[in-house]
Amino acid sequence: MNMFSKVFGTRSQREVKRIMPLVEKIESLRPDMQKLSDEELRGKTREFKKRLEEGETLDDLLPEAFAVVREAGKRVLGMEHFRVQLIGGIILHQGRIAEMRTGEGKTLVATLPSYLNALEGKGVHVVTVNDYLAKRDAEEMGKIHEFLGLTVGVVLNDMKQDERRAAYNCDVTYVTNNELGFDYLRDNMVIYKEQLVQRDLHYCIIDEVDSILIDEARTPLIISGQSGKSTKLYEACDILAQQLERGEASHEMTKMAAIMGEEVIETGDFVVNEKDKIVNLTEQGVHKVEKFFNIENLADPENLEIQHNITLALRAHNLMHKDQDYVVKDDEILIVDEFTGRIMPGRRYSDGLHQAIEAKEHVKIKRESKTLATITFQNFFNKYDKKGGMTGTAVTEEKEFRDIYAMDVVEIPTNRPVIRVDHEDAVYMTKKEKFNAVVNAVVEAHAKQQPVLVGTITIETSELLSRMLKRQGIKHNVLNAKFHELEAEIVSQAGQAGAVTIATNMAGRGTDIKLDDVARNACGLMIIGTERHESRRIDNQLRGRSGRQGDPGESRFYISLEDDLMRLFGSERLMKIFTSLGVAENEQIEHKMLSNAIEKAQEKIEFNNFGIRKNLLDYDQVNNEQREIIYKERRQVLDGENMREAIYKMIQDTVDTYVDMCFSDDVDSEEWDLNEFNGVLTPIIPIRPLTDESVKGKKRDEIRHELKEEAVKLYEEKEAEFPEPEQLRELERVVLLKCIDSKWMDHIDDMEILRQGIGLAAYGQRDPVVEYKMSAFDMFNEMITSIQEDTLRMLYHVHVEQKIEREQVAKVTGTNKDDSAGPKKPVQRKEIKVYPNDPCPCGSGKKYKQCCGRKNKA
């Protein structure tokens, strides 16, 4: 703590001090609220809504509203909000993050701002990390809201469309982050307004905000449909991947090394970079692949699919581990969430990786998916008018919360002092010695009836420790992705005297561990971490399971020099020093240098992960602006707006585009290329083709005016063919939706291809993000033009006897939350994409749009 903080207090302490007068005001209203009958207390909700209509603000109502909720909590649940919980509620209402220790009652805190903000009638979303917590909180905390006359809903994974709509229409809705994001995307794919389930995004309270906005923000939400590709190539690549030999690289290839022409000496058929989770074929490996598939050059454009799929197969075998990244259950590959250790049913890795794992595990290979809609959590949650968050650990990522989400973090003091003892890390040379030490520590604690919670990173480790404890005769519970259903029950019993629980990562987060009297007298819950996580914050979350509400407790991490964190990110020099010390077997190593190395390794990874998330956001910001325009256009169509004016504007714009492209007043009309003009415009708008006679002696604008008049007249004739004007209006909406959806889905793929290729701009000393923005702008304009032209082409050529029905462009087959690292590489097109402002490939020296681009439009 610096001198300023010692004198004036930390920023959080100053913020809490500023809020205290409000807390005192809420406290002072307590006697008045106690005097009210249940009916009078409920009547306060109607009174608050009326006062809002008369011009008062939520801030004006806050002290009374919080006092009402506090009294309702006491009457309904027998739980009265502590002063520190009132502080937390105020922070959440202000759109900030309240860092509250485990066991401080974050769930109860959320009832305060959710009630206050629900009074506006626009809906409040309380966001949790899984269905169990959403359902539990809706049932328990929802009683307070219902007692006060508000409606409460919950959205669960298996709910139908009408059930979701009813839940979102409630005053307070409990929902998981994934369901919320996917419902937003699905709402922007519906073809009738009645199919929408969500209202506008007004205010949300995010529980475990660090898990949702930081940990899960590295990968976007993706809704996918099935592509028509065969699965045979995955099987062939899987067979080949098992025949290839893993080698080593002399050093890592960096961009600077590539520019300087440094050579990397590689052995074997492929090398694996575990840090960045990337697999690369060596020259020897490339030759083997070419021989296997009987092709001349793997790098040829027509072989991109083979190149992509063999890389996926190698990743599946060398970087994706069974019972760590995924489990096999009922002939299916199920993803395990890397942050919680929970199974994510229905989620599939994107870009063919899931199919590669299916081939590896010899289960039925499902067809590859095509991205239909996608959004990042950063951009989704930034759509809310206001958002607040709660967690036990946020200060380490405060800068990211402020920079990306414009939310600052305020540490809320605990209701009772924390008396948990956090011991120094116990470090061993090998994993075997480390696990022996963990088992000895569990046996020792168990002997004195002290409950133990052992945190592991992988399912494999939890099962190994389980076997070792069985040999020692220690009765215990295992909580990992395989036993998901029993999660809450097992966690709630973990504080009983003599209980031993092994939990993968933060499984069971959100469920309180309460101690019995015997356990409390035996020094409380003992937390044992079997490995340091990549993030210090997740280590702190594990520690925070012990010592709730002033309970006693202990924590210690057990580490070996063979752990992934030390092996991949620790200093090699340091590792060599300790290896050469000749430490006796099972002897614990203690050294300040080692503690610093662990801390530095974690900081390195945190910085790296922040870079990944920031990079994702920089690129997705461009996509987000385009997505906003497209979704706004779709919503106007869904709202049943009269599209006649929009169609007329498309007619004018299309005529303008081709007149300006083909004609010039600087050139005599006799020299105009009428064949080119007729070839591009008449397939879209069936006007009479222009002839030398019809343009003779006329200026460009005169031609323009005549063409527009004729095009509008033709459209009016088309209108007259319909018995009812509304029939054509509905047809316009049907055609527009079809064209928007079809072109937007192709555009998503094009943008991903562009993003993967744009990284090469860095070699030319150009900023890849700037290059991406410029190219994306051209592509978007090209897509808009294409939507307009396809819409007009279909409307001008439609026949009245055709039945008008809306239909989805592509069928949704699933959702995807890809937690795999490494860049996503979409299906490549064989032809090279040429953008409007690129030099024309024919070599004329003109821009593509002014040369061959014209002809291709036809």
Task: Annotate each predicted stretch with a short phrase.
Residues 448-462, 639-640, 692-696, 841:
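Short, Lys/Glu-rich amphipathic helical modules
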Residues 326-334, 340-348, 549-550, 557, ...:
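Extended, charged helical/alpha-beta scaffold domains that provide interaction surfaces
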Residues 1-582, 632, 648-649, 653:
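Conserved P-loop NTPase motor core
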Residues 454, 502, 744, 780, ...:
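Hydrophobic, well-ordered secondary-structure elements that form the walls
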Residues 830-849, 853:
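Short Cys/His-rich zinc-binding micro-motifs
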Residues 1-2, 178, 814-822, 837:
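Compositionally biased, intrinsically disordered low-complexity regions used as flexible
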Residues 27-31, 617, 778, 838:
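Positions in alpha-helical segments
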